[in-house]
Amino acid sequence: MSMTRVLLVTLLTASSAFAQETNDPFPEPISSTDGVIRVNFTEFASVPDIDGQPARMMLLSDEPGTRRLFVNDMRGPLYSIDYDGRAVTQYLDIDGSDWGVSVQSSRNELGFQSFAFHPEFNRPGADGFGKFYTWTDSRNTAPDPDFTPGGGGDTHDTVLLEWTARDPSAATYDGDGPRELLRVEQPFGNHNGGQIGFNPTASSGDSDFGLL
């Protein structure tokens, strides 16, 4: 008990001394009548839970060709959202049994990392018509990876997939299975990919237009 009393006395003494030395440069309240910034929010859309767990959203992206927003859940689903936010539709579940992707999302950092729509996604006859890309962690570690960093073990792979929709404006994905473009071996369980995308400032005819 004596030690507690000593500490309390010391703290009180120090606090008192500190308070006496303080020189408040603004003794009067600063008026906030001009230039006040107010922050409000309105719920725009709600992405569904999975098995009672809230969606693990990673990226929200605009696809102006079909006038929709898209957002992914790291566990596999890709949702489309109307511009007014009223309709949220599952466009594709890349973890679905039809695709054989086997999304690895058992930990917070793992899962369906990112996606990108080709800038010509909704241009009939163009090379990028109907094409979009997903970048995801997968439990499948076959075929052999294109890149092996070394060190650690082969805990999972991160895979870049190309999907091709027959009708880009369809409510749900109507194409065949994806084409694998790149597979990277990950040596540790908390390693994964980052965001993928196209150069938003590139125009048709530029050297980097349509390059992921």
Role assignments for model-derived ranges:
Residues 1, 18-20:
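Basic/polar N-terminal segments that are highly enriched at the extreme N-terminus
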Residues 2-9:
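Sec-dependent signal peptide recognition
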Residues 9-12, 84:
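Compositionally biased, intrinsically disordered low-complexity segments
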Residues 14-16:
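N-terminal signal peptide c-region/cleavage motif recognized by signal peptidases
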Residues 20-212:
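Acidic, Gly/Ser/Thr-rich repeat motifs that build Ca2+-stabilized beta-propeller blades
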